[in-house]
């Protein structure tokens, strides 16, 4: 991006924001996995190598947690350990990687999701400081922001809507859908949430305690994949077309600079508010609740 646009400083800012976001997920994930599983510790079993359930000895807990975040942040989907067996908070950070769906871009689409958050940050930043929202010398107006906001909201809508539907069906008739869950309660909810997060984020990994090879799961996750893999491509391309048709405006004292660390912090804030906080209630019911129950709090 820096070479094509001849804006190396902006490219470094984008890379820095992505790196900070990635590290904020991978560091705690490795920490919690290396600390072991509280439920196993209560049995008097030593966990010098960390939580090793569902992991290969050659990788260990640290490398397994590291790759879990790598594969969920980049829509990779390959795994070197069973994500379903990871400690609750490591599973939470893996889910957040797919829920944010922006750090380092995705397979086949690059950083197209991050581009949406840049547009939103430009508009919000311009309004906050009273400057004209501009990006790469082109005015960012209502049409572009509406498209960006719709694209940003489709992702949580599909994940939370799908999770809500499956939770409603399971709670209403658990005997009919008993094959879905081997681990009901908080972890079962996490399995629902992870499945739709993976489908929506173009990932492919899963909490494999979920019995998901059924017509219901294949159809619902297929619809989520169809919606969340094509619309997020169409929207940013439409925004790019609108900006390309506008007259170039030279930078002035009233232009919000998009290559500074301040703007990078603003992008992180927008990602945190629009993407991460939208999922906080669901994460509270799933992995967070499981962690507190497992820890005896």
Mark where each language-model region is.
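C-terminal structured "cap/appendage" subdomains that terminate the fold
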Residues: 217, 222-270
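Membrane-helix cytosolic exit motif
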Residues: 124, 166-170, 232-245, 276-293
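In a subset of proteins, long, contiguous C-terminal domains/tails are tracked
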Residues: 252-297
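Selective recognition of specific alpha-helical transmembrane segments in multi-pass small-molecule
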Residues: 2-36, 108-113, 145-167, 228, ...
């Amino acid at each position: 991006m820096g070479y094509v646009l001849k804006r190396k400083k902006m490219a470094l800012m984008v890379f820095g924001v992505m790196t900070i976001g990635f590290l904020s997920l991978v560091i705690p994930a490795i920490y919690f996995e290396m600390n072991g599983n509280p439920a196993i510790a209560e049995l008097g079993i030593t966990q010098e190598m960390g939580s090793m359930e569902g992991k290969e000895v050659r990788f260990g807990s640290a490398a397994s947690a590291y790759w879990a975040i790598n594969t969920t942040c980049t829509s990779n989907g390959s795994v070197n350990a069973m994500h379903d067996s990871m400690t609750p908070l490591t599973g939470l950070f893996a889910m957040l990687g797919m829920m944010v769906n922006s750090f380092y871009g995705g397979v086949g689409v690059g950083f197209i999701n991050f581009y949406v958050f840049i547009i939103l940050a430009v508009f919000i930043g311009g309004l906050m400081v009273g400057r004209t929202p501009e990006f790469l010398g082109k005015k960012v107006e209502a049409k572009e922001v509406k498209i960006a906001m719709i694209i940003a909201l489709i992702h949580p809508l599909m994940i939370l809507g799908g999770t809500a539907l499956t939770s409603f069906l399971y709670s209403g008739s658990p005997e009919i859908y008993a094959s879905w869950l081997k681990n009901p309660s908080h972890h079962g909810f996490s399995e629902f949430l992870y499945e739709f997060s993976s489908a929506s984020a173009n990932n492919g990994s899963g909490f494999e305690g979920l019995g998901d090879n059924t017509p219901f799961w294949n159809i619902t996750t297929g619809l989520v994949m169809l919606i969340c893999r094509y619309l997020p491509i169409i929207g940013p391309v439409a925004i790019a077309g609108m900006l390309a048709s506008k007259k170039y405006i030279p930078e002035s004292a009233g232009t919000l600079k998009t290559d500074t660390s301040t703007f990078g912090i603003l992008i992180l804030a927008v990602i945190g508010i629009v993407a991460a906080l939208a999922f906080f209630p669901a994460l509270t019911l799933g992995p967070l609740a499981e962690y507190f129950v497992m820890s005896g709090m």
